[in-house]
């Protein structure tokens, strides 16, 4: 067990020290300048980021209960598999999945932009080529509720709602699509869980999305 933890720890460090694009370096410099400013004002910095590797492991684990619950409820409500996405060409299904991965990040951005100071101008997108992972980041501080709202909206809109709709209308394909998209939000779930578990007696807390890693950083005083 100790060796496994060490291996995961090494992967975490490798992830944090990955090669950044020019845009990521610019965002990181801007973030560190903001961090230094807040620390200079008496704030304490607390990292609430999650590892992409651990998020991928959690996604594998999460897929099992999602499949059991989704398929179980589907056949409790329906006695057979019917149309909709259930009859879609497998290639088109994969194309739709890739398109929804992009939409997933756009939903993060649109949701956070509602609360960001300069709205859409404060939202940027990137791609971790080492992990084939697209991401969205908000460059300005957000309140806790706003941060969580933006983090969970893709899960709700692309995962939970299609799952429920698939069960209700008897479309196994739509159910499967919802399950996959809900599972793709595993990292978002980890981030929100980490935020909700964090306890602080600080009078003021600022939530800022990390510009190059999954998750956020809080500043408290």
PLM regions: where:
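Metalloprotease/metallohydrolase-associated module, dominated by Zn2+-dependent proteases
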Residues: 2-78, 125-221
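Membrane interface segments of multi-pass transport proteins and intramembrane proteases
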Residues: 80-82
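Short pre-active-site segment immediately N-terminal to the catalytic Zn-binding motif
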Residues: 84-101, 147
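Charged, low-complexity, helix/coiled-coil-prone segments
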Residues: 93-106, 120-122, 138-139
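Active-site recognition of the HExxH zinc-binding catalytic motif
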Residues: 100-113, 154
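Catalytic Zn2+-binding segment of zinc metalloproteases
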Residues: 108-121, 198
């Amino acid at each position: 067990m100790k060796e496994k933890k060490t291996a995961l720890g090494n992967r975490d460090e490798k992830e944090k020290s990955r090669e950044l694009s020019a845009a990521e370096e610019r965002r990181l410099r801007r973030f560190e300048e903001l961090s230094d400013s807040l620390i200079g004002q008496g704030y304490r910095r607390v990292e609430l980021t999650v590892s992409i590797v651990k998020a991928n492991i959690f996604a594998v684990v999460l897929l099992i209960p999602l499949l059991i619950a989704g398929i179980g409820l589907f056949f409790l409500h329906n006695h057979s598999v019917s149309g909709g996405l259930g009859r879609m060409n497998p290639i088109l299904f994969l194309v739709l999945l890739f398109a929804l991965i992009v939409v997933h990040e756009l939903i993060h951005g649109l949701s956070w932009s509602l609360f960001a100071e300069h709205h859409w101008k404060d939202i940027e997108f990137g791609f971790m080529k080492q992990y084939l992972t697209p991401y969205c980041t908000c460059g300005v501080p957000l309140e806790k509720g706003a941060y969580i709202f933006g983090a969970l909206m893709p899960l709700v809109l692309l995962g939970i709602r299609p799952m429920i709709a698939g069960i209700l209308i008897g479309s196994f394909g739509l159910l499967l699509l919802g399950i996959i998209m809900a599972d793709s939000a595993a990292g978002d779930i980890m981030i929100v869980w980490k935020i909700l578990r964090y306890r602080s007696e600080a009078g003021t807390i600022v939530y800022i999305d990390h510009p190059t890693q999954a998750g956020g950083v809080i500043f408290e005083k």
